[in-house]
Amino acid sequence: MADKSKFTEYIDKALEKSKETALSHLFFTYQGIAYPITMCTSETFQALDTFEARHDDIVLASYPKCGSNWILHIVSELIYAVSKKKYKYPEFPVLECGDSEKYQRMKGFPSPRILATHLHYDKLPGSIFKNKAKILVIFRNPTDTAVSFFHFHNDVPDIPSYGSWDELFRQFMKGQVSWGSYFDFAINWNKHLDGDNVKFILYEDLKENLAAGIKQIPEFLGFFLTGEQIQTISVQSTFQAMRAKSQDTHGAVGPFLFRKGEVGDWKNLFSEIQNQEMDEKFKECLAGTSLGAKLKYESYCQG
């Protein structure tokens, strides 16, 4: 993941802010979407418009709790395999997080730059599309995503907790969580998944066959790796391997970022009524869409 000192320094500051923040005061709204005040500011969003993407930037777009830290590790290892240089993150890698001066500093960073983001498609800087940066879009089924949200808030010390799973579920379904609605994010990206510079990755596919999932990433980015290199990276990138070293790579929050990673963990918390509500929401927003088919909802979120 990121350079330990930079990553942990940013996370430590965010956790320190969280200590004094009640859940009811955790979010601010910018252009209609809720963001955590511990990680984002309106000044940084305003400065984001000045960000100048490069054609060889690698953008990792995902809704929160859908595997962004996992993909960051995988792409970093792919770059290392090609260049023989460990990828360094001079800034916290989430594009919209940090101070408003970060985009000026990023001009001096060497290529390729890895840029993670949880922004909806229409909130991304226009230069990403103008300069044809490569975009990996990572999705995870909405039921497990909601459960992961709940455990992150309620297990990590110092982060404001929800009173119950039912409370988190209500807020998740209304889109009143960090980075807004999962379904708005999905609807927004659905229209653009077939673009020449966009590659869709499903979290559940990586869990099922990590080596096959990893193999398609360098092919999309234009890297050549041998089968042996792919296999080595897949062994280093299993969820279990990531969890084992998470405290070294991500600091105290690491074990919570790599809590379980299981497909189907939602069954431990969802009531039958909540599952039906999620089914209806999915049908309303994504039934008959390209993304709806790619998410394999019937396989992962029903029964």
UniProtKB/Swiss-Prot annotation:
<dbReference type="GO" id="GO:0005829">
    <property type="term" value="C:cytosol"/>
</dbReference>
<keyword id="KW-0808">Transferase</keyword>
<feature type="binding site">
    <location>
        <position position="148"/>
    </location>
    <ligand>
        <name>3'-phosphoadenylyl sulfate</name>
    </ligand>
</feature>
<feature type="active site" description="Proton acceptor">
    <location>
        <position position="118"/>
    </location>
</feature>
<comment type="similarity">
    <text>Belongs to the sulfotransferase 1 family.</text>
</comment>
<dbReference type="GO" id="GO:0008146">
    <property type="term" value="F:sulfotransferase activity"/>
</dbReference>
<dbReference type="GO" id="GO:0005737">
    <property type="term" value="C:cytoplasm"/>
</dbReference>
<keyword id="KW-0963">Cytoplasm</keyword>
<feature type="binding site">
    <location>
        <position position="203"/>
    </location>
    <ligand>
        <name>3'-phosphoadenylyl sulfate</name>
    </ligand>
</feature>
<dbReference type="InterPro" id="IPR000863">
    <property type="entry name" value="Sulfotransferase_dom"/>
</dbReference>
<feature type="binding site">
    <location>
        <position position="140"/>
    </location>
    <ligand>
        <name>3'-phosphoadenylyl sulfate</name>
    </ligand>
</feature>
<feature type="binding site">
    <location>
        <begin position="237"/>
        <end position="242"/>
    </location>
    <ligand>
        <name>3'-phosphoadenylyl sulfate</name>
    </ligand>
</feature>
<feature type="binding site">
    <location>
        <begin position="65"/>
        <end position="70"/>
    </location>
    <ligand>
        <name>3'-phosphoadenylyl sulfate</name>
    </ligand>
</feature>
<dbReference type="Pfam" id="PF00685">
    <property type="entry name" value="Sulfotransfer_1"/>
</dbReference>
<dbReference type="GO" id="GO:0051923">
    <property type="term" value="P:sulfation"/>
</dbReference>
<feature type="binding site">
    <location>
        <begin position="259"/>
        <end position="261"/>
    </location>
    <ligand>
        <name>3'-phosphoadenylyl sulfate</name>
    </ligand>
</feature>
<comment type="function">
    <text>Sulfotransferase that utilizes 3'-phospho-5'-adenylyl sulfate (PAPS) as sulfonate donor to catalyze the sulfate conjugation of thyroxine. Involved in the metabolism of thyroxine.</text>
</comment>
<dbReference type="InterPro" id="IPR027417">
    <property type="entry name" value="P-loop_NTPase"/>
</dbReference>
<protein>
    <recommendedName>
        <fullName>Sulfotransferase 6B1</fullName>
        <ecNumber>2.8.2.n2</ecNumber>
    </recommendedName>
</protein>
